[in-house]
Amino acid sequence: MAEQISSARAEARTVRIAPRKARLVVDLIRGKSVAEALAILKFTPKAASPIVEKVLRSAVANAEHNYDLESANLYVSEAYVNEGATLKRFRPRAKGSASPIMKRTSHVVVVVSELND
């Protein structure tokens, strides 16, 4: 008998937001139900909120479409942000020198699982 899959995941790779800033948003939704997590993200005034919301909605859609899971029974079991590639730029400074600018990118991962009743 095949084992029932009870979780689905979604990723957004190389998103142009610093991982440190994205982690502040991801920490708010970890362990919450999907409906509660979406409500939190909607009213969080951070640049990472729409990005994380899009990944969460994608994970829910993957769960419904690929594994026939009910969205009402889902919760955010894992949510984390890893560091992506860093774009290195330089800002001209006084006396012909330059200062480095690190434009950091993130890999956002959200895993939703079914609640075990």
From Swiss-Prot:
One GO MF term, please? structural constituent of ribosome
Concerning SUPFAM superfamilies, the annotation shows:
Ribosomal protein L22
Entry keywords, A to Z = Ribonucleoprotein, Ribosomal protein, RNA-binding, rRNA-binding
Query: One Pfam family this chain carries?
Result: Ribosomal_L22
Any one Gene Ontology biological process term?
Answer: translation
Q: Is rRNA-binding set as a keyword in this record?
A: yes
Origin superkingdom: Bacteria
The family database entries (Gene3D superfamilies) matched by this protein are listed as:
Ribosomal protein L22/L17 (3.90.470.10)
Main role?
A: This protein binds specifically to 23S rRNA; its binding is stimulated by other ribosomal proteins, e.g. L4, L17, and L20. It is important during the early stages of 50S assembly. It makes multiple contacts with different domains of the 23S rRNA in the assembled 50S subunit and ribosome.
Would you identify the family this protein belongs to, as annotated?
A: Belongs to the universal ribosomal protein uL22 family.
User: Subunit structure, briefly?
Assistant: Part of the 50S ribosomal subunit.
Q: What is this protein called?
A: Large ribosomal subunit protein uL22
Q: Which organism is it from?
A: Lactobacillus delbrueckii subsp. bulgaricus (strain ATCC 11842 / DSM 20081 / BCRC 10696 / JCM 1002 / NBRC 13953 / NCIMB 11778 / NCTC 12712 / WDCM 00102 / Lb 14)
